[in-house]
């Protein structure tokens, strides 16, 4: 599950996760197995009479319904930027991340924090996840890693994810993870 207006790249899977029509039009994206939930952009809320806390509840309820409709067991992960990069560097509404993280934990859904924009001190903490007290299973990193002087990216895994990767490596051999620029 990703979010509309979120940006995660322009390849087949990352473009599908990106919630922007310009990355989908004429490319048969997003892939069917990729879901998008509502954008946590308070100024673009569907009902202008909603207070910020009500909008947070609306976002959370939308995610809960999606998970219920699809079945939590069919959902591998939720990906989101701590602060929505596309559309103007938009912080989430009050209480959003705390509530979203609880929904993910309650449904045993992995949480991926896309820290390409918010990582490496841009919010006053090393990662945007720290700023919002998030506990992601995976963190994606890039631009700030080299101050954008060189094309370098990476992933940081929680111990829970690392143990699964380590076990898989023992059984299946090394896991190839890389990209050619």
Task: Describe each region flagged by the PLM.
Residues 1-181:
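Conserved N-terminal phosphate-binding loop of PLP-dependent enzymes in the Aspartate aminotransferase
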